[in-house]
Amino acid sequence: MATYLEFEEKIKKIEEDIIVAKTKADEPAVDILEKKLEKEVEKTFKNLNDYQKLQLARHPDRPYALDYISGLLKNAYEVHGDRHYVDDHAIVCYFGFIDNQKVLVIGEQKGRGTKEKLQRNFGMPSPEGYRKALRAAKMADKFQIPILMLVDTPGAYPGIGAEERNQSEAIAKNLFEFADLTTPTISVVIGEGGSGGALAISVADKLAMMRYSVYAVISPEGCSAILWNDPTKVETAANALKITAENLKELNLIDDVINEPLIGAHRQKEQAIFALKEYFIKSLAELKKLTPQERLDKKYQKLMNLGSFTK
């Protein structure tokens, strides 16, 4: 059963009417309602504000990293553990094939249902998760296997244990080491890109975002609490932070926006997975035309350009 957001109420009503018409085998009514639905979807989703896009990025039915991995990879083989502490299930690492191309996919996994959410720590990685990602990336770099990173986290885990095991160092080391990888690297924000937790697997030759994903230094809830000390200002904060794919492309903070289905990846998962696959194949072909040193030079220049602004 579909989960509807507040701004989808009209869509929900039309879809319920379609179900009733189908049970009555009223084909003319179904045709009329389906055309009405198409117009309502276009009207609703072409006029979303940033807060509504944030809601879509966090939608419980939105495809997570493992959904993309199962749809993209053949002969997938998972890498476990950081060889120092434990295996952090908030980050998954799989070697496999996309078509005939051997790849490594690193993803942040939130989990579905109470049991898996707890196992995955709600998609908030600990230091050992980032160290596992780096271990797998180093292995891929050694054999020049391209890397696809799937970003989807509210942020790195802020618990005492994570801090004791040096969370900030783990993130900083990933930024440093991923910047120096010579194999082609592509990072895609598929849902929520929260702060350093997202940055740790975002340094890449190409950084893209799905149409309804978000990428921010702080959550709108955190911003609302700090700036206004008012939890009712979340929507204002979301619209002010410039966290959407469209905003960040205009600011040249990301390279590309992947056009997931207009109605959202949560409603048309196969189409969303296909769109990401097409982007990966196209981007990888472009990166393969460059030498490893040329890729490093372009990555360096891109990173050095971050932070430029206009008055």
Curated annotation (Swiss-Prot):
Domain of life: Bacteria
Swiss-Prot/TrEMBL catalytic activity: N(6)-carboxybiotinyl-L-lysyl-[protein] + acetyl-CoA = N(6)-biotinyl-L-lysyl-[protein] + malonyl-CoA
Domain CoA carboxyltransferase C-terminal: 36-286
GO molecular function, one term: carboxyl- or carbamoyltransferase activity
Metabolic or biological pathway: Lipid metabolism; malonyl-CoA biosynthesis; malonyl-CoA from acetyl-CoA: step 1/1
Function: Component of the acetyl coenzyme A carboxylase (ACC) complex. First, biotin carboxylase catalyzes the carboxylation of biotin on its carrier protein (BCCP) and then the CO(2) group is transferred by the carboxyltransferase to acetyl-CoA to form malonyl-CoA.
Membership in a protein family: Belongs to the AccA family.
Name the UniProt record assigns to this protein: Acetyl-coenzyme A carboxylase carboxyl transferase subunit alpha
Species this chain originates from: Aliarcobacter butzleri (strain RM4018)
UniProt lineage: Bacteria, Pseudomonadati, Campylobacterota, Epsilonproteobacteria, Campylobacterales
